[in-house]
Amino acid sequence: MKPSLFVGVMSGTSADGIDVALVDFSQATPALVGSESHAYPNHIREHVLGLCTPANNEIDALGQLDVELGKLYAHAVNSLLANTQTPAAQIQAIGCHGQTLRHRPLGSGYASPFSLQIGDPNTIAALTGIATVADFRRKDVALGGQGAPLVPAFHAAVFGSTTTDRCIANIGGIANITCLPANSHIAGYDTGPGNALMDAWIEANQGAKYDAGGAWAQTGKLNQPLLEILLQHPYFALPAPKSTGREDFNMTWLQACLNQTNLPLPPEDVQATLTELTAISLTDGVKRSCPNAELVICGGGAFNTALLERIQHHYPQKPTVTSQQLGIAPTWVEAMAFAWLAMRRLENQPGNVPAVTGASREAVLGGIYTP
């Protein structure tokens, strides 16, 4: 059978770089042909994080970063195609999520909800010679939805089972769950912080980009008073559909919570407590929405041993596994999802799940940008 090749490009809330995946959709189960990760240059990451924080942000800075990210995404795609010896002419489309700078969905207090991703798809298409699908979230928002999470439709397509209840937990900067009951309807939402707070805290205190394996967290002790303050964030009490981002969970908020404790906490204790926050908020969502389901972890959090241990502790019903056990490496699930969403766009098939996002109907997502 002739390959059906698409490229997925993903930059998540962690704002640490680019995951790019070459996927063949010609068979019932998607095949990962090749994949690469490209770290953001330091100055690009600083610009992204700067524009993620509400301030007197310059339009000039936004416009330039939009194009610079487009160039980086194109470079990542071209590198992957070269290393897999795949001609650009064989690729049907690139699906590029872009870099989220602001996510203000329905319920966040804004009269006109919006979700903003940058990474110019015109630049990507021009520099790769490949049609590029981008701007996936705003149609769902226009239909009254959260615009997130968008991966549940892909999760259902590749991880759904007619015999086993599953819950797919994607732990990136933000954590989200997709409930896949056997022979029933999909549910899902963002549960709260994933890696974002843990990454920001270790970078501020240790100079590391992330807590490898959760090793630093394991040297600390859970601080119960701090955990209780963190869990008072109003997001956790909101009903689904709901989605969140850095706007809700960031270092400014964390510092305010630390100030409330009136305690001089060792930084490793804070890290251990942030790990617990992610584990509790995620497993609370699983227990509420899909109790007794098999819990499958993907995203960067799948490599945090300390976090997985705490998740298993709070959700002992079934062994916690990673998506590797279902045939897809945890690192590449999201990039593959946006390759799949690009395929859905070319086929004029819906990519959202209204039961998850709250949109008024299913919709074809994304715009097509030709070379």
Curated annotation (Swiss-Prot):
Entry superkingdom: Bacteria
HAMAP family referenced in this protein's UniProt entry, alphabetically: AnhMurNAc_kinase
Keywords: ATP-binding, Carbohydrate metabolism, Kinase, Nucleotide-binding, Transferase
Pathway: Amino-sugar metabolism; 1,6-anhydro-N-acetylmuramate degradation; Cell wall biogenesis; peptidoglycan recycling
Organism classification: Bacteria, Pseudomonadati, Pseudomonadota, Gammaproteobacteria, Cellvibrionales
Species, as recorded: Saccharophagus degradans (strain 2-40 / ATCC 43961 / DSM 17024)
Recorded name of the encoding gene: anmK
Binding site for ATP: G12, T13, S14, A15, D16, G17, I18, D19
Keyword hit for Methyltransferase: no
Coiled coil: none
Catalytic reaction list: 1,6-anhydro-N-acetyl-beta-muramate + ATP + H2O = N-acetyl-D-muramate 6-phosphate + ADP + H(+)
One Pfam family per UniProt: AnmK
Record protein name field: Anhydro-N-acetylmuramic acid kinase
